[in-house]
Amino acid sequence: MKKLKINYLFIGILALLLAVALWPSIPWFGKADNRIAAIQARGELRVSTIHTPLTYNEINGKPFGLDYELAKQFADYLGVKLKVTVRQNISQLFDDLDNGNADLLAAGLVYNSERVKNYQPGPTYYSVSQQLVYKVGQYRPRTLGNLTAEQLTVAPGHVVVNDLQTLKDTKFPELSWKVDDKKGSVELMEDVIEGKLDYTIADSVAISLFQRVHPELAVALDITDEQPVTWFSPLDGDNTLSAALLDFFNEMNEDGTLARIEEKYLGHGDDFDYVDTRTFLRAVDAVLPQLKPLFEKYAEEIDWRLLAAIAYQESHWDAQATSPTGVRGMMMLTKNTAQSLGITDRTDAEQSISGGVRYLQDMMSKVPESVPENERIWFALAAYNMGYAHMLDARALTTKTKGNPDSWADVKQRLPLLSQKPYYSKLTYGYARGHEAYAYVENIRKYQISLVGYLQEKEKQATEAAMQLAQDYPAVSPTELGKEKFPFLSFLSQSSSNYLTHSPSLLFSRKGSEEKQN
């Protein structure tokens, strides 16, 4: 029996060695027999997108954006790296799918019947409507009926082209438009505010973000109803990628991650106020340059631009501001709070900013550790505005009403209830002006978006002006000038020192295509 056992062992080992030796010659060895297997064998998920404030951009060299963040998490879910290719317009995105250069398109693309004939849609995650925009002060059309190709231009591959054709066939036979093959929707909106173009069409979310920096852009009319936004992948008999996407989004929905990401990028609201935004941006030009050094000096755990947005919400950057309730100064501190922080003069801008930051940091340190890092600031700001105890009540109420107390998206919805007796009467700390705290945080977020985008727009303009100057005044030798070389760098520094940042633009478009490895 012992000998027989040894023979079987020998045969087994021999068979195993033979199988290993022959394995590479088997026809299906190494072949990725489905799309997910191919992605995992390659070790990277190839995603094509476009530069917009919402989908994909960079600040301080770091990529961010709703679609980028979701794509990065999906790549992690698959256990591979993310490779991002940035294209100029929507047509180029679908070319990537057609040519096998992308696994997915993640670019805020609208689901529609024409696209799904040729491409596989994924789960939908938010919705937009298509809107016609014009420049404030120019003629506002009330209908599409009389628009011509000389007035209306849209981006290539834009989903609205199908809607325009339907409207032309059924309602407005005189309607015509032009497609600019070289520009995306953001660039066309820039052309509108610069007076180069009368009208263009973009989605409602893109317009809302653009208006934070360019309040002179206005909506003339809606072209479509709300349309779901989705990702697209190749359409064939292989459904493994679609199944993985469905599982991924279901998991994100169940654990609240999707809601948190959407709150981060879409939670600023759409109640755009032209006058308020214009007033704020004028203050950025006129007042901020004097205060910027103080914001940069005392902002520690937060971005100085967020601190500036907080101060504007508090006092409109007025160091002498006083409210009927007795709060005073740049950061509108109460007398008791100022005394506890060692502030001797609340109307001294530096003391007020320094004290306000320390008070905010104290609120930040009290926010429960279970709150995600990138949402802690919003809980702290709510506490800064209405008191830490009432913020705890808001969290408790969120739990009682089956929400997530660690999700700002859930908690902020309950804030207005703190001033309603059926709710505050059952809470530990009673009545609070929760609706004011809600508006307070939302306004700060809007001012921050406007400030970041506007300063970076200034950087773009300064760079373009410098490049134009270099073209207009080409380099010559000191001998030819009879003096020192033209102080080009000095000019750039002086003309833009109040605005230059070390980050690429948030709200202006990029040309060409780029690839990023993450």
Curated annotation (Swiss-Prot):
Gene3D superfamilies: 1.10.530.10, Periplasmic binding protein-like II. Residues 22-269 are annotated as: Non-LT domain. This is Membrane-bound lytic murein transglycosylase F. The N-terminal domain does not have lytic activity and probably modulates enzymatic activity. The C-terminal domain is the catalytic active domain. Murein-degrading enzyme that degrades murein glycan strands and insoluble, high-molecular weight murein sacculi, with the concomitant formation of a 1,6-anhydromuramoyl product. Lytic transglycosylases (LTs) play an integral role in the metabolism of the peptidoglycan (PG) sacculus. Their lytic action creates space within the PG sacculus to allow for its expansion as well as for the insertion of various structures such as secretion systems and flagella. Its EC number is 4.2.2.n1. It is found in: Cell outer membrane. It is a peripheral membrane protein. In the N-terminal section; belongs to the bacterial solute-binding protein 3 family. In the C-terminal section; belongs to the transglycosylase Slt family. The lineage of its organism: Bacteria, Pseudomonadati, Pseudomonadota, Gammaproteobacteria, Enterobacterales. Residues 1-21 form the signal peptide. One of its GO terms (molecular function) is peptidoglycan lytic transglycosylase activity.
